[in-house]
Amino acid sequence: MRLIVVSGQSGAGKSVALRVLEDLGYYCVDNLPVNLLNDFVESVREINQNVAVSIDIRNLPKEPQLVTATLDQLEAATDINLNVLFLDASKRTLLKRYSETRRIHPLSIGQEKLSLEQAIDLEKTLLAPLVEQASIVIDSSDCNLYELSEQVRFKVEGKEKQELIIVFQSFGFKFGLPSDADYVFDVRFLPNPHWEPALRPLTGLDAPIHSFLEKHAEVLELKQQIQGFVEQWLPMLEKNNRSYLTVAIGCTGGKHRSVYLTQKIGEYFEQLGHQVQIRHASLEKHQQG
């Protein structure tokens, strides 16, 4: 199991880092007290999933050596690959971020009533043991949200860009538009196998439907055009820091034409090495009916 402990200065980007790790498939827990870390790790040992935990200044123990001892104990475990990811930023950057968001620093809330600058300085001192044990340190001073996300992804996975999952989904307009679609292609103008009595009971996954549709040049031309559209803009969409791209293809009932095109186009992108999911939402309704 890989365990990443995320910590850092308040306002340096811990929440962003945790969201990136969640997108990478990590089981994430925010603001776990250090004294519960061992018990938590023990409880998730069997889930067969990488884990990320954020440690906040508010839940650090009063004795700094307890942090070091806890992390040393976890690092000694043979079945745990421990990394400490520390998010840092310059005082000037943190002051600016707090000014822009108008949030209160966690250490300014206590009885000491510290100024923002004093709180930042104190936090830096209190987090020193974690910095010393960090295997990954990221300075977010000059990063925007997307740049920081890419840095975290690169440091953790060795690649900057998130691998986009392309979802190709067929549907029937009579059942309504899919709510999660990024792009919708209406293919109701194509020749319809529904009007061939022998083909009507079949679906777009069956060979006789393939043969019928592939006799029509407009079907093959549209397939090429949809593939070309997605291929052309995929690099830009991948740079947009998104996890999913959903392409919906619809015909009247979602049984023949849209199913055929969705399946063929999805398989085309699978063969190119992309992460692809193929769904036939309306086809499931026909089968249930």
Curated annotation (Swiss-Prot):
Pfam family, one: RapZ-like_N
SUPFAM superfamilies the UniProt entry points to: P-loop containing nucleoside triphosphate hydrolases
Residue sites binding GTP per the record: 56-59
Protein name: Nucleotide-binding protein VS_2760
Family: Belongs to the RapZ-like family.
Coiled coil: none
NCBIfam families: PRK05416.1 (NF003828)
HAMAP family: RapZ_like
Cited function: Displays ATPase and GTPase activities.
Binding, ATP: 8-15
Top-level taxon of the source organism: Bacteria
Gene Ontology molecular function: ATP binding; GTP binding
InterPro entries on file: P-loop_NTPase, RapZ-like, RapZ-like_N, RapZ_C
Keyword Nucleotide-binding belongs to the record: yes
Ranges annotated as spanning the membrane: none
Organism, as annotated: Vibrio atlanticus (strain LGP32) (Vibrio splendidus (strain Mel32))
Keyword entries, A-Z: ATP-binding, GTP-binding, Nucleotide-binding
PANTHER family assigned to the protein according to its UniProt record, in alphabetical order: RNASE ADAPTER PROTEIN RAPZ
